[in-house]
Amino acid sequence: MDVVSRFLLWMEAERRYSPLTLRNYRRDIEEFARWRGVTCATLDFENIARKDIQDWLYYLSDRRKLKASTVNRMLASLRTLWRWMLAHGHVSKDIMHGVRQYKTPRALPIFVPDTRMRDVVEELRSDLASEDIWRVRDALIILLIYTSGMRLAELVALNDEDIAADCRSVVVMGKGRKERVLPLLASLGKIIKKYFSLKYSQNICIAEKKALILSKKGVRINCRAVQRVVEQKLKGVGVAGRTSPHVLRHTFATQLLNEGADLREIQELLGHSDLRATQIYTHLDIAKLRDAYHKAHPRERDDEDSGGTRDDSAHI
């Protein structure tokens, strides 16, 4: 077994990383191997220098035109592999020391405005009233993410047994294989019960009887299929811009913050290990306040009336 395969097995067993995370690690390492003109199995790690890593990052950024966040993720995958190899005696020097990440702009999370989200929920009512399991399933996908804030990978990995008997909570497996319990709305619990009833009465489970969300082939749905469902439903009611499961997750967190939820409570629900990851939503709230200030403050209106030439210090 080659070094990379052993590293991934260790990550699965010791770090309890999800299959999706492990695939991402392998893909990033394979990308580096291809750039070197070899495979993961034939990478000669002892003959790789710091400059090789820096040249690869330059290639990704300047030739491939990848975003800084993508380049940094790929670097992080290789850096984690290298630390593991150092600890297990597969390499003798730390070439990653001194290799810096690319600077990334701090982008505010994209979310669906509350009024537009009401349109989405209203549009789902006909699906929820249907006896067509696939229409009910699609509505359930949207509502599970929007009302619980779970990640795409967490949704796809759900099993029937993860739903509490009363359908008022769900256990999800987050990053680092960390479990957390998410509350579910009573109305959503009724939808889940209906979905269960349709699913088992029609006996559509073929290969994966445990999986909660199924494809039309009767097996566990994949991430891309969920993305298509979300995109179709959101664009169908006129939601502009990005329409991904992660946008629904951002919408969940943004609405909680706007309704006065504590930041640490939101952190727990989202499964963020670091509060700083959750604090980005406070920046969003500050941006909203700033916009409201510019629209409503009387001195701001005075400034607009004067063409922006007035000495503000004399009028405050």
Place the predicted regions along the sequence by residue:
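Conserved catalytic core of the tyrosine transesterase superfamily
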Residues: 1-316
